[in-house]
Amino acid sequence: MARRQRRRLLQLMAIGLGVLLGRPVLATTSRRPLGPISAGQRTLITEFLLVHTQLLAGYVLSGADGQANHATLDSLRRQGDGLMQRIKRELFTRIERGEMAQLEARWRTVADATRTRPTLDIARLMLPMAQEVAAPLGALLPPVDIKAAGGNEGRARRRLLMSQLLLDGVSACWSQDLTHWDQMDERRVMLEKWLNAVAQQGTGGVRLLAQWNLFASALPLRNAHCLPGAAHTLQSVGERLYKLL
């Protein structure tokens, strides 16, 4: 029964991915011109994206080391469900109704996939769809402002980059065939530039750089094997660094 359910899930995800590849990326669809989002909306988006990333990283990490923390994954799914309901209520003027329905359906598919025994087949189908969950929400956030290193402007975007980089690294440690190496390198360079700018201002920069250096040293190089324990280092240090950004 479990094998049949897993096969069916793979089929559904393959169909969903095929639909995604045959249509424009959700993040590029039209949004109503309402000006910048509020601080509360930025916080809501980043909270959801963090839970979203923690869930995916936890699933991928359990596949890498063969040990799944089901209680933690269950808790993250519940948190994600609650935050998604808030997103539907608070961002309905930003995302069209049909697009919001697609966003919720994709989140549900990804969340359901994390209930299965981790396999590379599921992960390879799940991760692109997970990006389609994050993309339209990330598109609402302000751009990273390297010059305004000490301010709050762009903080949500930096946290999004951090969460994406965390997922990239953990995924690469498991599958060793990450298809978005260039994107991971771009995120790494952008965050490093911002952290160096913060360090020059001397406000918490030393602590940030210390955590970043630990995180960056665990990131896999292109098509290279991860160091022993690197996936766990990426997850623990990445989540700590996320909170400091």
Positions of the model-derived regions?
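Short, flexible coil/linker elements and helix-boundary hinge sites characteristic
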Residues: G22, G63, G98, R115-R117, ...
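Short, solvent-exposed segments of well-ordered alpha helices
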Residues: V25-E47, Q67-D74, R94-R97, L120-R124, ...
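N-terminal export signals
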Residues: A2, R8-A27
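Generic secondary-structure microfeatures
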Residues: R6-R7, M162
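Heptad-repeat alpha-helical coiled-coil/4-helix-bundle sensor or tether segments in soluble regions
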Residues: H70-E132, M190-L244
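Extended amphipathic alpha-helical interaction segments
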Residues: P118-V206
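N-terminal extracytoplasmic segments of bacterial inner-membrane proteins
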Residues: G35-A68, A149-D177, Q235-K243
